[in-house]
C-alpha cells in the first residue's frame, strides 16, 4: 500500500510566485469544519473580518475585535494543512501607529500560527506594511473599496471610474507592492483599472468585484454557498444555495420531534442485558 501524499502548507512566498502562472483560489473561512472542507481546494484561506456580518449579524465590520479574529484564526488553523491562512487585522488594531500594528500583528501570528495578516489601506499604510515586513510579518494588502472605511466613501459602491479616484487606487496598489506586501486584494474596482494595476505591479492581485483580470479571486464563503441572505453583491456568484436546505432540514427535524418519530429505535441506547 502506498503512503498517503502529504502536501505542505502553501506560504506567502509561494502565493507571490503564482503571479502570472496560475490563478489564485481564495475563500474566507471562520470555523474549523468549514475550513476542513475548503482547504483541499484553495490556495489561500482568509479569516476575514467579514465574519462580523455573516456570523455575528453586525451591520459592518467595524465592531469586530482583535480577540474575535484570533479566536477564529485558531479555529481555521486547526482545520487546515494545505492552504496559506491569512488573518484580517480588524478596524482600530493597526491604524494608530506602525508600532501598534506590529504589536497586534505579532500577537495574531503568535496566538494563531497563521501565515500572515491582511490590512486595508494604500499610500497612508505603506510605511506600516514595510515596518511589519521588515520584522518578519507577511502582509496581504487591500485597496480599492475598503469596508473598514465605508463610512468615508459613502457606502458600498464600485470605485475607479473617475480619473482622480482611479489615480488614487493605482498609487495605493503601487505603494503597497513597493512596501513589500506579498499580494494585494483589489475590491469593488472597475475592470479596466483592475487590469491595469495587475499589469503594473509585480505582486499578485486578488480580486473581489474586480473582474477576472486579477491574478486570483476571493469570495466570502457564506455568499458563495448561498448561506448569507441579507444582501447579494453584484459580483457574487452563488455556487450553491444552502440556506433553503438548512431551513428544510430544520423543518423536517422539528416535524419528526413533534410527531415523536425522532429519535427512532436506531438512535436510542438500549439497556444493558440483565440490568
Swiss-Prot record:
GO terms of molecular function: 3-methyl-2-oxobutanoate hydroxymethyltransferase activity; magnesium ion binding
Q: State its location(s).
A: Cytoplasm
Q: Which residues form the active site?
A: 187
GO CC annotation terms, alphabetical: cytoplasm
A biological process term (GO) from this entry: pantothenate biosynthetic process
Entry keyword set: Cytoplasm, Magnesium, Metal-binding, Pantothenate biosynthesis, Transferase
**Which InterPro entries does this UniProt record tie to the protein?**
Pantoate_hydroxy_MeTrfase, Pyrv/PenolPyrv_kinase-like_dom, Pyrv_kinase-like_dom_sf
Q: Which reaction does it catalyse?
A: 3-methyl-2-oxobutanoate + (6R)-5,10-methylene-5,6,7,8-tetrahydrofolate + H2O = 2-dehydropantoate + (6S)-5,6,7,8-tetrahydrofolate
UniProt cross-references to Pfam families, sorted A to Z: Pantoate_transf
Q: How is the cofactor bound?
A: Binds 1 Mg(2+) ion per subunit.
Q: Enumerate the residues binding 3-methyl-2-oxobutanoate.
A: 49-50, 88, 118
Enzyme Commission no = 2.1.2.11
**Where is Mg(2+) bound in this sequence?**
49, 88, 120
Q: In which pathway does it act?
A: Cofactor biosynthesis; (R)-pantothenate biosynthesis; (R)-pantoate from 3-methyl-2-oxobutanoate: step 1/2
This protein's cofactor list reads: Mg(2+)
The record's principal subcellular location, in a coarse class, is cytoplasm
Function of this protein? Answer: Catalyzes the reversible reaction in which hydroxymethyl group from 5,10-methylenetetrahydrofolate is transferred onto alpha-ketoisovalerate to form ketopantoate.
In terms of NCBIfam families, this protein maps to: panB, PRK00311.1
Q: Which family does it belong to?
A: Belongs to the PanB family.
| PANTHER family per UniProt | 3-METHYL-2-OXOBUTANOATE HYDROXYMETHYLTRANSFERASE
Assembly mode: Homodecamer; pentamer of dimers.
Name of the protein: 3-methyl-2-oxobutanoate hydroxymethyltransferase
